[in-house]
Amino acid sequence: MAINTDFNLGEGVKAARKLLRTYVNVGTPETKEWFLVGSGVEDSSIELNPNTESVTDILGVTTTDVTKWEPAQSFDPFTIKGGSALAFKLHEIWTNKTPELLSQFEVMIVYRYIGTEMNGYEAELQKNCTINITSIGGSAYVDMPIEISYSNDSTKGTVKFEDNAPVFTPDAA
């Protein structure tokens, strides 16, 4: 794998939001079926939610350490649409009252502003993520906003696309 040393953007060019993509595996660990999340969502960021510890020494100097991140990402609205395997899977978890299944998702973040189509884009695969349904309802359509809590059980790698489907390859150890 080629080592990336810069973004695949021109000097001073801002990365379009659509280049940061979140996929959820709605298949099995053996037969992955990646669902791209974000259709109809105008704004979604991965909030890092850092845990910090600050100490002021006897000289009055404050130092702050980041001890961990608890990253999460909200998708609101997440409108129920025909053909949405993720919405159907979450709806089944809701109606079957099996919330323990909400913490067993594989989520992949693809950074399409790092890498190339030929060599692959930088990505990370996270296992045992939680996808929480925050509500269900709406006004004109049935929305089911979700929040993904990332696990930090992650593997870095690259993604290439075959027939519009992402294929993840872990980095060599």
Describe the role of every protein-language-model region.
Residues A2, E33, V41, N51-G60, ...:
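A broad "ordered helical/assembly scaffold" signature
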Residues A2-G82, N128-Y141:
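Solvent-exposed edge beta-strands and adjacent loop segments
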